[in-house]
Amino acid sequence: QEPDRPQPFSEYTVTVQAEGYRSVEVSAIDVFANVTALQEIRMEPLDISQKEGTENIVVPPNTLWGDFPPKIPEDEVKPVNESGEIVLSRVVIPEYVIVHDGPPTDTRAQDYYVRYRDYIKNVASSEIYSTWPEATLRANILAIMSFSLNRVYTEWYRGKGYDFTITSSTAYDQKWSFGRTIFSNISRIVDEIFNHYLSRPKVQQPILTQYCDGKNVTCSGWMTQWGS
């Protein structure tokens, strides 16, 4: 894979209206050629006392196109014998994760309760292009899942006193975006392999599979998204 220029997708705005419900407008929706884009819309019913209004959602750019901070390097296998550390006894595929929508220390950032599969689909749709070959999509999605399950298994943030599973900051974790458009081929692959992860011989925990784009940021020893 090579970096695409110019912009490899079009952007659209979708407005959804229904009587008795608050309207929703989603802007900056990515649409790629020959790939079905899926946009979830959740509408809130209006109370009698409420006036009609519109919820505005702006989808951030894909990390391959936008400007985001690079990942701060960490050990791919976390120590699990430290006194007082919280760690699960076995690898568990969670039904839900709690996503902190910002850096760990940002107390103003909102926390979202997200189904694990939906979280992976969101991150993959935020981090890679849906037009890439199937084998490339699978490799990247597997890395995303292993990273996520390492955070779950080690209870990384809860062990530091936080009440969430993972953040949406690319400096610490992976990009997750509220209202993100999901792509049908990415959704299908996640449904097929959602309980898979990478590990090392004699290592029980999923490894923290860190990666970078390989163009704007280089990362020796990590997977690069361009060229994967």
Identify the residue ranges that each predicted region occupies:
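Conserved, single-site charged/polar hotspot
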Residues: 2-228
